[in-house]
């Protein structure tokens, strides 16, 4: 069996740790971006309803209470159902 020399072993470990760190950093940035978008969606939909906009054309894009576009909002993707304060994951079958 081929045995690595010490310098080669250090190079392999260094390369692996670099790629692991890079992948982890990308995953963290991606997760934070997703959370930021979700919070933004929830904030926009909440303010659209709080402003008392009853016109369908006015709050069609931001209202999480309308049944037509509720499934595209971050509240559904995060499992936050209307009228429920508990956190639940949506079940897909």
From Swiss-Prot:
Main location: membrane
Subcellular location: Cell membrane
Residues spanning the membrane: 12-32
Recorded GO CC terms: plasma membrane
Gene null: resulting phenotype: Not essential, it can be deleted.
UniProt KW Membrane keyword: yes
Keywords, in A-Z order: Cell membrane, Membrane, Transmembrane, Transmembrane helix
Region: Disordered, residue numbers: 47-66
Membrane-protein topology: Single-pass membrane protein
The protein's name: Uncharacterized protein MG220
